[in-house]
Amino acid sequence: MPSVSIWGWLEQELTVDTSWWTQHSGGTVDEWDLCAHLESQYGPVLERRYAAWITPADVDTLATADVNTLRIPTTCAAWVDVPGSQLYHGNEVSFLSSIASYAINKYDMHVIVDIHSFPGGANGFPFGEARGHYGWFNNQTALEYSLKAVDAAISFIQSSDFIQSFTLEPINQPVDVEVSRSSEHLIVSQTGGASYSSNQSLGKWKPSMQKSRLCSS
């Protein structure tokens, strides 16, 4: 299954397009601080990015290389506006819909929608919300907003004309690996997440997901 992950489009990482990052970031290392640095301009800057970084012509190019699966990372903020978050909540879903519809209708591609970050931070990496953010674990409020994001992504897929052409990746690399604790033993939950803590959030994830519309027909 030839596939491509479309980094740096609906979620930003400093290593993907270094020229763009250098132009806009002010020396920051993650999207959270990028948005804070841009202040009132972060919306227009990111909207221009969404419109230009990936276009139907790029999908055409991928199709000529026999790519048949697109994995598209998004931030949690693409799906739900989280109070206190620096991440931008704008027209990400509209851009996702446009490219996904084109890829599916013209080339019968499969699209994996990836929710790449969660409120509070699920792994401490720059792409996990922000560098050093581990606050998702054992945080009921963060979990509730995460489930709202998952529910919104499911609604997006269910409202499409090609539900069978999508897969949802509801969480990316959840692990609270702080450098100061790197010599300790990890606890691995039944969902595959790893944690030094009690895994309460990870343990709740599976039954909570079962209550969501993932299980509806």
Model-derived features with residue positions:
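N-terminal carbohydrate-binding accessory modules
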Residues: 1-67
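An active-site-proximal structural segment forming one wall of the substrate-binding cleft
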Residues: 41-70, 84-117, 127-168
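Active-site-proximal beta-strand/loop segments in catalytic clefts of secreted hydrolases
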Residues: 4-9, 73-76, 114-118, 169-174
